[in-house]
Design a protein with these regions (language model features):
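Rhodanese-like catalytic fold shared by cysteine-dependent sulfurtransferases
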Residues: 1-38, 45-78, 84-123
Length: 123
């Protein structure tokens, strides 16, 4: 498991105070019920290429603020963001809320939690 630096963990913890998180199980329920949502993978290009949650779109953490309004113009859209382990996506969720998106959730355990729960990924 990757060891994160104390300063990175500090800013993630700060972001997590302001955001809502969602578990893999609740995300799967929402997807199975066909609830309208936008699932966004915020990992790097090479991570996306190695596999992602079916139905997700890819907007890496480095470009999401620049491109989100083109991909998701309605700020009321239910958005769920994920990364590998739930850290980077917390930062992204906080940023999207600052941009006026009102229904943003971070996948608490990231893609690894999705896989650990036994759910499929698309390669």
């Amino acid at each position: 498991m990757k060891q994160h630096s104390p300063r990175f963990l500090s800013i993630v913890a700060d972001s997590k105070k302001r955001i809502e998180e969602i578990t893999p199980q609740i995300l799967k329920e929402k997807m199975d019920s066909l609830e309208p949502l936008c699932l966004i993978d915020v990992r790097e290009d090479n991570e996306w290429a190695s596999g992602h949650i079916p139905g997700a779109i890819h907007l890496g953490k480095g470009i999401i603020e620049r491109d989100i309004e083109k991909e998701v113009p309605d700020s009321q859209t239910l958005i769920i963001v994920y990364c590998s382990g739930g850290f980077r996506c917390a930062l992204v969720a906080d940023s999207l809320q600052n941009m006026g998106y009102s229904q943003v959730y971070s996948l608490t355990t990231g893609l690894q939690g999705w896989i650990d729960a036994g759910y499929n990924i698309k390669k």
